[in-house]
């Protein structure tokens, strides 16, 4: 219903798996390209968020181009959520400021001092909030789509890393194309998943092989 079409077998299986998980954990969805893994992941994420109290999602992709391509679909999904609560969205990669759809949203940016009660802001309930535009606060927005390195950096010992952990701790984390990552990236992914496990964060891994 959220996407305007009935779920196929893969999407139905993902939703059933999300509904039957006893506790936050890792849901692995392996299927060939073109079967609707993205919609399956978002539908499962919505179920997991409702069941385990998450307040948003992080969608990690391997490249800036794939993140840009998926951004309009994620925005549409976010805008079709059933309640009218205001939410923030963030495109998190180094060239985000060149994305036309993201630039359009920035023209409707919510100032830091705004309490979201401005009638003029009610038409667009998913917005780019000014406070989340900084690189350190990027993962604190409700809906974050970006390159997977935004997640991998949570495995590093670096300044302000606790803000990444804080942003991820309240979300459902989706990692796409995980079959394409090399051994070097997988070491950081393993460590990041270990942290997410301690935080009881539901994780969805998407793979084509």
Sequence positions of predicted segments:
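N-terminal helicase ATP-binding lobe
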Residues: 1-209
